[in-house]
Amino acid sequence: MDPLRQPREEFVKVLGEVSRELGLPEVPEVERTRRYGFFSARFHKYKVDHSRLAEVVNLIKNKRFEFLSSLSVDGLYLNADLNVSKVAELVFEAVVKMGRKYGFTEECVTGSYLVEHTSANPVHPLHIGHGRNAILGDSLARLLKFCGNKVETHFYVDDCGVQVMYAAMGYNAVKDEVKKRIEKSKPDVVIGHVYSATNAVAEIGRLKKELEKAQDDERKREILREIDEWVAVLKRLMDSEGDIISKIAEELGRRDLLNEAVELNRRYESGDPEAKGVVREVVDLVLKGQRETLARLGVEIDKWDYESELTVWSSEAMRIVSELQKRWPQYIEIKGGAVVFRADKFVQDYNLWDVLDLPRFIPPVTLTRSDGTTLYVTRDVAYALWQARQGFDKVIRVISTEQTHEQAHVRIILYALGYVDEAKKIVHYAYEMVNLPGMKMSARRGQYISLDEILDEAAERSASLVKEKNPEVSGVIAERVGVGSVRYAFLTTSPRKPIEFKWDVVLNLRQNSGTFLQYTYVRAYSILEKAGEIGNVPVPENMLAEERELVLKIAEWPSVVKEAAKSLRPDYVAEYLDGLALVFNSYYEKAPVLKAEESVRGFRIAIVNAVKTVLEAGFYILGIPTLTKM
């Protein structure tokens, strides 16, 4: 139920009458700008004379309307204000009938969706950047589910490639030590250190070989600086995992790790049982830790898709390379044994920029290594094709803007292979990075802030903050406040804008934070607990300004949900909830509810109930935990 449906229909009738009088070929669209009225319509494109528009509106403005309170003309805008008392009746009726589903409308239902998100490499813990991905993907899924759509969430387990092989090789060298260590620590944390150390040892070995061949003194000094940097990485890792890191350096230091990793990857991709056992053991350990972190955030994954199973062992990735070579030999080049597809020329020749929503610059794409093994993008094409064939209307892939070209290549190659409908199903839901002031991150060097560390600090800071108001706050409440604050911080900004993560903003009790919203919810909940049953609600003709604003704000909720779902923008929900909470808290400070006069007490309790209902629905969409005390 949408409380604004009937008022909007009444305004559309007015627009129809005005348009007929003016002899217009169509009725202007209704806009909700609230600039000069709650509803507006622009007559600019029809070249209407302003005085004639005003004259026509004057003829009908004094009619009796059920939901419109006034009509006015400003330039070539026709504006309408609403009868807020009538709207309040519609709002309360919708809230009582729909409860926590208030906000859902039939227009909100748009189809079925496969949402792939997080998909972190299984070599280290989820870090703060993965946090934004996971929370965005989870909230998109929640938003689409709230709207009645069929939604399935997927995590792509990238278990192929040299980096995963480094983790497996390092783990194999110190397996006994790692097993003891993970009895007390999360497995993804320990494997993350093992991976970074193995990578550092491999880089030191590679650079030493390069140093032997270097002839230029400047290049030699540059290589020595790089070696020193990687040695520093090992020393830093020893502070947390001394015995394990020392053994990795000792066991692997004299081996050609890069070539060994390439060979192990080749064996793994060919399905060698021994290689599968080594790699899967370490991958599953990391996934166990990543699952724990996601559960802590309230993120649920429906299906875990292993890259090896869906794209490599099925031979699907190699089939794609072979088919592309047969179909489009004129766009294929062989460079050093590697297969390259000239995606740039293909897009230009077939003018595909608008068809596939592509960036203007498209580089060529390498499909295989010189040894014939497939690369990430090739396997990703195979995975995208598999996703597109799962019976969903759209496939939403939550992947950072850093992969804009790779994701464009996926759609281009699908199109080139004749999978046109499948290519058009794929949506690259791009998002920008999360910046921590003073912190430069590199997973290969073991330099990152894990998502668990962020959540730990959020809980700790939340406990200190909330205990100032309520000394009896438990650790469970502090954890839920921390989770809410982190989720909101990652959702309140447009996905296309980078986030500067600052604790004073994340835990602001006065505005624009998950903590602020949770505090507002607790306030509304507390009032309703004391109020008891909500009986008949007579709506007063005269309301406080904040009451009028709250009624109209609550009435807008279904429209906000519909627009957020249509645009795939959970930040619209976050922005709306912050605005609602600001108005409600201002109202709370000015107007007594429980001790109000009997003539308005029921009305005010109904407003509080409506605010609480909207917050509950919004919290579900954003994944913010609800609290009854704080």
Curated annotation (Swiss-Prot):
The keyword Cytoplasm applies. GO terms for cellular component: cytoplasm. Keywords: Aminoacyl-tRNA synthetase, ATP-binding, Cytoplasm, Ligase, Nucleotide-binding, Protein biosynthesis. One of its GO terms (molecular function) is arginine-tRNA ligase activity. The keyword Glycoprotein does not apply. A motif ('HIGH' region) lies at residues 120-130. It catalyses: tRNA(Arg) + L-arginine + ATP = L-arginyl-tRNA(Arg) + AMP + diphosphate. Pfam families: DALR_1, tRNA-synt_1d. GO terms for biological process: arginyl-tRNA aminoacylation. Its EC number is 6.1.1.19. It is an enzyme of class 6 (ligase). It comes from the Archaea. It is found in: Cytoplasm. Belongs to the class-I aminoacyl-tRNA synthetase family. This is Arginine--tRNA ligase.
